[in-house]
Protein backbone atom coordinates (compact mmCIF):
# COMPACT_ATOMS: atom_id res chain seq x y z
CA UNK A 1 0.00 0.00 0.00
CA UNK A 2 2.79 2.40 0.91
CA UNK A 3 4.57 1.95 -2.42
CA UNK A 4 1.33 2.74 -4.27
CA UNK A 5 0.82 5.89 -2.20
CA UNK A 6 4.43 6.89 -2.80
CA UNK A 7 4.05 6.33 -6.52
CA UNK A 8 0.84 8.39 -6.69
CA UNK A 9 2.24 11.19 -4.53
CA UNK A 10 5.43 11.45 -6.56
CA UNK A 11 3.53 11.48 -9.83
CA UNK A 12 1.23 14.18 -8.46
CA UNK A 13 4.31 16.25 -7.63
CA UNK A 14 5.62 15.75 -11.17
CA UNK A 15 2.30 16.90 -12.65
CA UNK A 16 2.30 20.00 -10.44
CA UNK A 17 5.81 20.90 -11.58
CA UNK A 18 4.75 20.09 -15.15
CA UNK A 19 1.91 22.63 -15.01
CA UNK A 20 4.09 25.27 -13.34
CA UNK A 21 6.70 24.96 -16.08
CA UNK A 22 4.02 25.21 -18.76
CA UNK A 23 2.63 28.41 -17.25
CA UNK A 24 6.08 29.98 -16.89
CA UNK A 25 7.39 29.09 -20.33
CA UNK A 26 4.22 29.42 -22.37
CA UNK A 27 5.00 26.16 -24.14
CA UNK A 28 1.94 24.50 -25.61
CA UNK A 29 0.48 21.74 -23.48
CA UNK A 30 0.27 19.35 -26.42
CA UNK A 31 4.01 19.59 -27.10
CA UNK A 32 4.86 19.28 -23.43
CA UNK A 33 2.58 16.26 -22.99
CA UNK A 34 4.36 14.51 -25.83
CA UNK A 35 7.68 15.22 -24.14
CA UNK A 36 6.35 13.94 -20.81
CA UNK A 37 5.18 10.69 -22.40
CA UNK A 38 8.57 10.25 -24.07
CA UNK A 39 10.38 10.96 -20.79
CA UNK A 40 8.20 8.45 -18.92
CA UNK A 41 8.82 5.82 -21.59
CA UNK A 42 12.57 6.23 -21.32
CA UNK A 43 12.49 6.78 -17.55
CA UNK A 44 10.57 3.65 -16.66
CA UNK A 45 11.83 1.25 -19.33
CA UNK A 46 15.33 0.96 -17.90
CA UNK A 47 14.10 0.60 -14.32
CA UNK A 48 11.54 -2.06 -15.19
CA UNK A 49 13.99 -4.08 -17.30
CA UNK A 50 16.50 -3.87 -14.45
CA UNK A 51 13.88 -5.17 -12.01
CA UNK A 52 12.84 -8.05 -14.25
CA UNK A 53 16.48 -9.08 -14.72
CA UNK A 54 17.56 -8.38 -11.14
CA UNK A 55 17.64 -11.97 -9.93
CA UNK A 56 19.59 -13.28 -12.90
CA UNK A 57 21.90 -10.26 -12.90
CA UNK A 58 22.63 -10.65 -9.18
CA UNK A 59 23.55 -14.32 -9.59
CA UNK A 60 25.82 -13.49 -12.53
CA UNK A 61 27.45 -10.49 -10.84
CA UNK A 62 28.30 -12.32 -7.61
CA UNK A 63 28.76 -15.84 -8.93
CA UNK A 64 26.27 -16.99 -6.31
CA UNK A 65 25.10 -20.59 -6.36
CA UNK A 66 21.48 -21.33 -5.52
CA UNK A 67 21.10 -24.12 -2.97
CA UNK A 68 19.06 -26.84 -4.66
CA UNK A 69 19.98 -29.64 -2.27
CA UNK A 70 21.93 -28.79 0.92
CA UNK A 71 25.40 -30.33 0.87
CA UNK A 72 26.30 -29.70 4.51
CA UNK A 73 24.90 -28.56 7.86
CA UNK A 74 25.51 -24.88 7.11
CA UNK A 75 23.57 -24.96 3.85
CA UNK A 76 20.80 -26.98 5.49
CA UNK A 77 20.52 -24.49 8.36
CA UNK A 78 20.60 -21.53 5.96
CA UNK A 79 17.85 -22.94 3.76
CA UNK A 80 15.64 -23.90 6.70
CA UNK A 81 16.10 -20.52 8.41
CA UNK A 82 15.26 -18.45 5.32
CA UNK A 83 12.23 -20.58 4.47
CA UNK A 84 11.01 -20.52 8.08
CA UNK A 85 11.28 -16.73 8.23
CA UNK A 86 9.55 -16.37 4.86
CA UNK A 87 6.68 -18.52 6.09
CA UNK A 88 6.44 -16.44 9.27
CA UNK A 89 6.31 -13.28 7.13
CA UNK A 90 3.58 -14.77 4.94
CA UNK A 91 5.81 -15.06 1.87
CA UNK A 92 6.49 -17.81 -0.67
CA UNK A 93 9.85 -19.52 -0.19
CA UNK A 94 12.60 -17.48 -1.88
CA UNK A 95 15.62 -19.01 -3.57
CA UNK A 96 18.65 -19.09 -1.29
CA UNK A 97 22.20 -18.71 -2.56
CA UNK A 98 25.77 -18.42 -1.29
CA UNK A 99 28.50 -16.42 -2.99
CA UNK A 100 32.23 -16.29 -2.31
CA UNK A 101 33.36 -12.93 -0.95
CA UNK A 102 35.65 -11.58 1.76
CA UNK A 103 33.03 -8.93 2.53
CA UNK A 104 30.55 -9.81 5.28
CA UNK A 105 27.31 -9.16 3.44
CA UNK A 106 23.94 -10.39 2.22
CA UNK A 107 21.29 -9.08 -0.15
CA UNK A 108 17.77 -9.72 -1.37
CA UNK A 109 16.54 -9.20 -4.90
CA UNK A 110 13.90 -10.32 -7.37
CA UNK A 111 11.08 -8.92 -9.48
CA UNK A 112 8.34 -9.87 -7.02
CA UNK A 113 7.59 -11.60 -3.74
CA UNK A 114 6.90 -14.76 -5.73
CA UNK A 115 10.25 -14.64 -7.51
CA UNK A 116 12.81 -13.50 -4.96
CA UNK A 117 16.33 -14.40 -3.91
CA UNK A 118 18.26 -14.14 -0.65
CA UNK A 119 22.03 -14.47 -1.01
CA UNK A 120 24.72 -14.44 1.66
CA UNK A 121 28.50 -14.25 1.42
CA UNK A 122 30.82 -16.97 2.64
CA UNK A 123 32.47 -14.35 4.86
CA UNK A 124 29.17 -13.72 6.64
CA UNK A 125 28.69 -17.42 7.32
CA UNK A 126 32.27 -17.73 8.56
CA UNK A 127 32.34 -14.62 10.76
CA UNK A 128 28.87 -14.44 12.33
CA UNK A 129 27.18 -16.65 14.86
CA UNK A 130 23.95 -18.27 13.77
CA UNK A 131 21.94 -15.86 15.92
CA UNK A 132 23.64 -12.90 14.23
CA UNK A 133 23.19 -14.42 10.78
CA UNK A 134 19.53 -15.04 11.59
CA UNK A 135 19.11 -11.32 12.24
CA UNK A 136 20.67 -10.53 8.86
CA UNK A 137 18.48 -13.05 7.05
CA UNK A 138 15.36 -11.60 8.69
CA UNK A 139 16.47 -8.16 7.49
CA UNK A 140 16.58 -9.44 3.90
CA UNK A 141 13.23 -11.21 4.24
CA UNK A 142 11.80 -7.88 5.45
CA UNK A 143 13.01 -6.20 2.25
CA UNK A 144 11.03 -8.78 0.28
CA UNK A 145 7.97 -8.48 2.52
CA UNK A 146 7.98 -4.68 2.20
CA UNK A 147 8.19 -4.90 -1.60
CA UNK A 148 11.30 -2.73 -1.58
CA UNK A 149 12.58 -3.88 -4.97
CA UNK A 150 9.35 -2.82 -6.68
CA UNK A 151 9.15 0.40 -4.66
CA UNK A 152 12.64 1.45 -5.66
CA UNK A 153 11.87 0.64 -9.30
CA UNK A 154 8.79 2.88 -9.24
CA UNK A 155 10.69 5.67 -7.49
CA UNK A 156 13.64 5.44 -9.86
CA UNK A 157 11.29 5.46 -12.85
CA UNK A 158 9.56 8.63 -11.63
CA UNK A 159 12.90 10.31 -10.89
CA UNK A 160 14.25 9.35 -14.32
CA UNK A 161 11.12 10.75 -15.94
CA UNK A 162 11.40 14.02 -14.05
CA UNK A 163 15.11 14.39 -14.88
CA UNK A 164 14.56 13.88 -18.62
CA UNK A 165 11.41 16.01 -18.78
CA UNK A 166 12.66 18.96 -16.70
CA UNK A 167 16.05 19.07 -18.43
CA UNK A 168 14.53 19.10 -21.91
CA UNK A 169 11.80 21.59 -21.04
CA UNK A 170 14.32 24.07 -19.68
CA UNK A 171 16.65 23.41 -22.62
CA UNK A 172 13.79 24.11 -25.02
CA UNK A 173 13.02 27.38 -23.25
CA UNK A 174 16.68 28.46 -23.42
CA UNK A 175 16.99 27.49 -27.09
CA UNK A 176 13.77 29.30 -28.04
CA UNK A 177 15.14 32.53 -26.60
CA UNK A 178 18.07 32.47 -29.01
CA UNK A 179 17.78 34.78 -32.00
CA UNK A 180 19.68 32.48 -34.36
CA UNK A 181 17.61 29.43 -35.27
CA UNK A 182 20.71 27.76 -36.71
CA UNK A 183 22.30 27.48 -33.26
CA UNK A 184 19.09 26.46 -31.49
CA UNK A 185 19.59 22.74 -31.98
CA UNK A 186 23.14 22.75 -30.61
CA UNK A 187 22.18 24.91 -27.63
CA UNK A 188 19.21 22.67 -26.89
CA UNK A 189 21.22 19.45 -26.76
CA UNK A 190 24.09 21.03 -24.81
CA UNK A 191 21.80 22.51 -22.14
CA UNK A 192 19.73 19.29 -21.99
CA UNK A 193 22.82 17.13 -21.40
CA UNK A 194 24.23 19.42 -18.70
CA UNK A 195 20.89 19.64 -16.89
CA UNK A 196 20.34 15.88 -17.06
CA UNK A 197 23.66 15.40 -15.28
CA UNK A 198 22.79 18.01 -12.63
CA UNK A 199 19.22 16.78 -12.08
CA UNK A 200 20.44 13.17 -12.12
CA UNK A 201 22.86 14.08 -9.34
CA UNK A 202 20.00 15.50 -7.26
CA UNK A 203 17.74 12.56 -8.09
CA UNK A 204 20.39 10.17 -6.78
CA UNK A 205 20.32 11.98 -3.45
CA UNK A 206 16.56 11.48 -3.24
CA UNK A 207 16.79 7.79 -4.16
CA UNK A 208 19.52 7.15 -1.60
CA UNK A 209 17.63 9.06 1.10
CA UNK A 210 14.66 6.77 0.55
CA UNK A 211 16.96 3.74 0.53
CA UNK A 212 18.31 4.71 3.95
CA UNK A 213 14.77 5.16 5.26
CA UNK A 214 13.92 1.73 3.92
CA UNK A 215 16.89 0.19 5.75
CA UNK A 216 15.49 1.32 9.10
CA UNK A 217 12.20 -0.36 8.18
CA UNK A 218 13.97 -3.59 7.26
CA UNK A 219 15.86 -3.51 10.58
CA UNK A 220 12.55 -3.12 12.41
CA UNK A 221 11.12 -5.99 10.38
CA UNK A 222 14.08 -8.15 11.33
CA UNK A 223 13.44 -7.37 14.99
CA UNK A 224 9.88 -8.66 14.58
CA UNK A 225 10.88 -11.82 12.73
CA UNK A 226 14.04 -12.85 14.55
CA UNK A 227 14.13 -10.70 17.68
CA UNK A 228 15.60 -7.27 18.28
CA UNK A 229 18.72 -8.53 20.04
CA UNK A 230 19.74 -10.71 17.10
CA UNK A 231 19.59 -7.78 14.69
CA UNK A 232 21.49 -5.54 17.09
CA UNK A 233 24.11 -8.26 17.57
CA UNK A 234 24.49 -8.60 13.79
CA UNK A 235 25.04 -4.86 13.33
CA UNK A 236 27.53 -4.77 16.19
CA UNK A 237 29.37 -7.68 14.63
CA UNK A 238 29.65 -5.70 11.41
CA UNK A 239 31.11 -2.81 13.39
CA UNK A 240 33.57 -5.10 15.14
CA UNK A 241 34.80 -6.68 11.92
CA UNK A 242 35.12 -3.47 9.92
CA UNK A 243 33.04 -0.79 8.27
CA UNK A 244 31.96 -2.87 5.25
CA UNK A 245 32.51 -1.58 1.75
CA UNK A 246 29.55 -0.54 -0.36
CA UNK A 247 28.57 -3.22 -2.87
CA UNK A 248 28.76 -2.28 -6.52
CA UNK A 249 25.70 -1.30 -8.51
CA UNK A 250 22.08 -1.92 -7.66
CA UNK A 251 22.85 -4.78 -5.26
CA UNK A 252 23.95 -2.24 -2.65
CA UNK A 253 20.40 -1.02 -2.19
CA UNK A 254 19.29 -4.37 -0.80
CA UNK A 255 22.40 -5.43 1.11
CA UNK A 256 22.84 -5.48 4.88
CA UNK A 257 25.93 -3.36 5.32
CA UNK A 258 26.63 0.35 5.12
CA UNK A 259 29.38 2.86 5.83
CA UNK A 260 29.43 6.46 6.84
CA UNK A 261 30.87 9.66 5.49
CA UNK A 262 30.40 13.42 5.44
CA UNK A 263 28.85 14.85 2.32
CA UNK A 264 29.26 11.49 0.61
CA UNK A 265 26.83 9.98 3.13
CA UNK A 266 24.06 11.63 1.08
CA UNK A 267 24.86 9.14 -1.67
CA UNK A 268 25.08 6.02 0.49
CA UNK A 269 22.30 3.44 0.35
CA UNK A 270 22.60 2.66 4.07
CA UNK A 271 22.58 4.74 7.26
CA UNK A 272 25.65 4.55 9.54
CA UNK A 273 25.68 1.35 11.58
CA UNK A 274 25.63 3.24 14.88
CA UNK A 275 22.41 5.01 13.90
CA UNK A 276 20.77 1.74 12.98
CA UNK A 277 21.82 0.21 16.28
CA UNK A 278 20.55 3.25 18.17
CA UNK A 279 17.19 3.09 16.38
CA UNK A 280 16.74 -0.55 17.37
CA UNK A 281 17.87 -0.03 20.95
CA UNK A 282 15.44 2.85 21.49
CA UNK A 283 12.51 1.14 19.77
CA UNK A 284 9.75 -0.46 21.81
From Swiss-Prot:
GO cellular component, one term: plasma membrane
Active site: 140
CDD domains per the UniProt record, alphabetical: M48B_HtpX_like
UniProtKB keywords: Cell inner membrane, Cell membrane, Hydrolase, Membrane, Metal-binding, Metalloprotease, Protease, Transmembrane, Transmembrane helix, Zinc
Alphabetized GO MF terms: metalloendopeptidase activity; zinc ion binding
Gene Ontology biological process terms, A to Z: proteolysis
Membrane topology term: Multi-pass membrane protein
InterPro entries membership: HtpX_protease (IPR050083), Pept_M48_protease_HtpX (IPR022919), Peptidase_M48 (IPR001915)
EC identifiers of the protein: 3.4.24.-
Regions that span the bilayer: 4-24, 33-53, 147-167, 187-207
Similarity comment: Belongs to the peptidase M48B family.
Protein name per its UniProtKB record: Protease HtpX
Native source species: Mannheimia succiniciproducens (strain KCTC 0769BP / MBEL55E)
Lineage: Bacteria, Pseudomonadati, Pseudomonadota, Gammaproteobacteria, Pasteurellales
Encoding gene per record: htpX
Amino acid sequence: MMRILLFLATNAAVLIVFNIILSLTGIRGQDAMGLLIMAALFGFTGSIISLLMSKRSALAATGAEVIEQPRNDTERWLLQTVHSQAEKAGLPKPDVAIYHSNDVNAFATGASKNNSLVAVSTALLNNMTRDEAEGVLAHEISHIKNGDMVTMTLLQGVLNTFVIFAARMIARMVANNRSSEESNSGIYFLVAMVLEVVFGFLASMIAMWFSRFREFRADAGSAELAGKQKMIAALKRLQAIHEPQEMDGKLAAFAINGKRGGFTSLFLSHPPLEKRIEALETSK
